Amino acid sequence: MSKRNHWYDYLWVLTALYLALGFFNILFAWLGLLCFFIPLIMASTFGTKSYCNKYCGRGQLFELIGNSWKLSPKRDIPSWIRSHTFRYGFLLFFTTMFVNMLVSTYLVFTHAIYFHKTVSLLWTFDVPWHWAYSGGAQPWVAQFAFGFYSIMLTSSILGIITLLLFKPRSWCVYCPMGTITQLICRWKHRK
């Protein structure tokens, strides 16, 4: 008997579309905030990780690439990556990068620094991305878009690297949003 597909089984299309749209117009990066707020709202409201388990388009995309395209060796992820130390350390690092992006956006808003049309891959490599922005928005709006897209693209690259080395959804083990929603769920159930 085959598995019945639901509408939410195709949310990976939105993730792929989001990543593709950022190549053509960086302002679409603002849509990525949905992937930030929806898991937080769902975890706070329901006290479950249902977003991660059922609705996360990125996890679905990694599953598609790893399983359907057979690009994953399906090895277990090392225990040190699953450890609380690594997960919370990675969350702290990711949060620091997010705050750095917000500070850069604020500095562009206050005209303290110039707006940069680059995407930072793996928080290290600034890649020119000028073709994806033709103007029309306040510089700080575009700066936030470049920064947020950098975070989303970097996390996608990390997810693809880990699916090529381990199981398809290995990224989910150390995903910062997954760690935050897990903390929210624990806090909610302790009340």
Which positions does each model-derived feature cover?
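Non-ligating segments of multi-cofactor redox enzymes
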Residues: M1-K191
